[in-house]
Amino acid sequence: NILDGYVRXEGAWLLSRIYLDEVEGRDVVYYRT
């Protein structure tokens, strides 16, 4: 799933921000699995 759950680590959180900013233009705390 693309939005599976909340991010637990800073690294994953940062990557999720970059990914979601490019794809959806949103600033949320989800990560890809």
Swiss-Prot record:
Places the protein is found: Secreted
Temperature-activity profile: Optimum temperature is 40 degrees Celsius.
Reactions accelerated catalytically: Preferential cleavage: Lys-|-Xaa > Arg-|-Xaa, higher selectivity than trypsin. Converts fibrin into soluble products
Enzyme class: hydrolase
Keywords from the named record: Blood coagulation, Fibrinolysis, Hemostasis, Hydrolase, Protease, Secreted, Serine protease, Zymogen
Protein name as it appears in the record: Plasminogen
Protein family per UniProt: Belongs to the peptidase S1 family. Plasminogen subfamily.
Gene Ontology terms describing biological process: blood coagulation; fibrinolysis; proteolysis
pH dependence comment: Optimum pH is 8.
Record GO terms (molecular function): serine-type endopeptidase activity
Enzyme Commission (EC) number: 3.4.21.7
Protease recorded as keyword: yes
Protein purpose: Plasmin dissolves the fibrin of blood clots and acts as a proteolytic factor in a variety of other processes including embryonic development, tissue remodeling, tumor invasion, and inflammation; in ovulation it weakens the walls of the Graafian follicle. It activates the urokinase-type plasminogen activator, collagenases and several complement zymogens, such as C1, C4 and C5. It cleaves fibrin, fibronectin, thrombospondin, laminin and von Willebrand factor.
Gene name, Swiss-Prot/TrEMBL: PLG
One GO CC term on file: extracellular region
Keyword presence, Protease: yes
Further comment found in the protein's record: Plasmin is inactivated by alpha-2-antiplasmin immediately after dissociation from the clot.
Domain of life according to the entry: Eukaryota
Lineage: Eukaryota, Metazoa, Chordata, Craniata, Vertebrata
